[in-house]
Amino acid sequence: MARQTYSGPVRWVIVDDGKQQQQTTFSRKHWELVFVRPEPFWDGSNTQARNLQAGLAQIGGIEWVVIIEDDDYYAPQWLETIFGQFKNAELIGERRARYYNVQTNIWRRMENMTHASLCSTAMRSNALTLFRDIATTEYKFIDIVLWEKAKSRHLFDSQLTVGIKGLPGRAGIGSGHDRHFYGEFDRDGSKLREWLGADSQYYMNDKDGKNATQADRTGRPIR
């Protein structure tokens, strides 16, 4: 986030339900950080919906919301691109997600042409209202339901995000986190370097959690 090219004001709502609060060193002009610590703290169950609702409670109806997941990769142009795309619809996102499992070195370009992964989705206005309604435990895959129900939606191609799978810590719910996730084998890490450039160093061979980003993993600072 420190390298994002978007120069406008940002209010970053960070939801952290780990037992130990994540250390934060991030500071940037025109950025406000809001920390939310929902309780009870994570006990091994799926707290995605609970945490989303806790974050949404801090957000007003006229705000534009960009979902950022702490283990995924966002190119520096991501926020700038997103805000440029908001002219097209109330719900916007990047299609054909790119997934990379750092445990198995398996990568895959997904075929999602009718929805974006939650990590690469943004919303405003009626789409934000809809998201509040469906971000509940009733739905396992909230992103798919959101894109099915939204009336004003737009998908674009940008290759600016990568869903990083298999990091240490709590397991993700998507198929990419499974060790049996199929795709192409990246024998020498060249695909990860192609996708992430120098930032690949934070993910390559991260099998012991030394580069993990969640407080539940190592407490690595937010940046």
Q: What residues fall within each predicted segment?
A:
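Active-site acidic Asp-centered loop
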Residues: 17, 68-70
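Active-site-proximal specificity loops/subdomain of glycosyltransferases
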Residues: 21-62
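Short beta-strand/loop segment that forms part of the nucleotide-sugar
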Residues: 8-19, 36-40
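Conserved catalytic core of nucleotide-sugar-dependent glycosyltransferases
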Residues: 66-68, 75-141
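C-terminal catalytic/acceptor-binding lobe
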Residues: 133-223
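Short, acidic, metal-binding catalytic loop of nucleotide-sugar glycosyltransferases
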Residues: 1-9
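Active-site acidic short loop of glycosyltransferases
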Residues: 8, 59-63, 88
